A protein has these predicted regions:
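Structured-RNA-binding interfaces characteristic of tRNA pseudouridine synthases
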Residues: 2-258
Length: 258
């Protein structure tokens, strides 16, 4: 449930880009440096009071973002000044844009209607030292047409147990398995030679869902699975039936819809 800011506070939102290879994921972890930890510490240093951050999607270690969205409550401040100061403290691996006051019931996570991720593969004869942090290098020539055809089987509402890590939630104080039913709005496999880009938009994602779908599509692109196999993989609801999880560096959270 989304609540309004405490008395004397305003709600703010911002877009955030980051190089995920420099952090151990987005979510705070006291033992390692994370995106949320760096942002919160920087905001608290500038603003002078405790901050609680909410994000649209908690990316894993090594996963990047161009269009992550955060929200938080704070006392009134000079937006332009705070944004400049924040970018100085967070550079060079995090950039904050479009910091603005928003409505009291906005929540970066729960107000979102969809998220779009891009997965980038370098499909070339030679690796590229300038893209290795942001793409999965695969030398074997991929059958992009078969990958695109196969990908359409994931569109719609499905139980994505075959493509996600199991998770639990607390219900009345007891742990229960979380639902892995999700709705994929669109998926496209693009030839952007020498890169192959896989764009996926869904209302929400479960853990490792995009990377598992990509790993399966790559197996199809290499001829190790048939393009007709995706539907049966979904219906099995068995993680072992899908392809391997693609490495994190090729994945970027591109946009969040509201």
């Amino acid at each position: 449930m989304v609540s309004a800011p405490p008395h004397g506070m305003n709600r703010y939102r911002a877009s955030v880009s980051y190089d995920g290879g420099s952090f151990h994921g987005f979510a705070e972890n006291p033992d390692v440096e994370t995106v949320a930890g760096k942002l919160r510490e920087s905001l608290e240093k500038i603003i002078g009071h405790e901050i609680h951050l909410t994000c649209a999607g908690r990316t894993d270690a090594g996963v990047h973002a161009e269009g992550q969205v955060i929200s938080f409550d704070a006392e009134t401040f000079d937006i332009e000044k705070i944004e400049r100061s924040l970018n100085k403290l967070c550079a060079p691996f995090i950039t904050v844009r479009d910091l603005q006051k928003t409505n009291d019931l906005f929540n970066a996570r729960f107000s979102a209607t969809c998220r779009t991720y891009r997965y980038r593969i370098l499909n070339d004869d030679y690796p590229d030292p300038f893209s290795h942090r942001f793409a999965w290098y695969i030398q074997t020539q991929l059958d992009i047409d078969s990958m695109q055809r196969a990908a359409q089987a994931v569109v719609g509402e499905h139980d994505f147990s075959s493509f996600c890590r199991k998770a639990t939630i607390l219900v009345d104080g007891k742990e229960e398995e979380a639902s892995l039913i999700r709705e994929v709005i669109s998926i496209t496999v693009k030839d952007e030679g020498p890169f192959v880009e896989i764009w996926v938009t869904a209302t929400s994602f479960c853990h490792q869902m995009v990377r598992s779908i990509v790993g399966t599509l790559v197996a199809i692109g290499k001829g190790r699975l048939n393009k007709s196999d995706v539907s049966s993989i979904i219906s099995k609801k068995d993680r072992n039936s899908a392809g391997p999880v693609a490495p994190p560096q090729g994945l970027t959270l591109m946009e969040v819809g509201y």
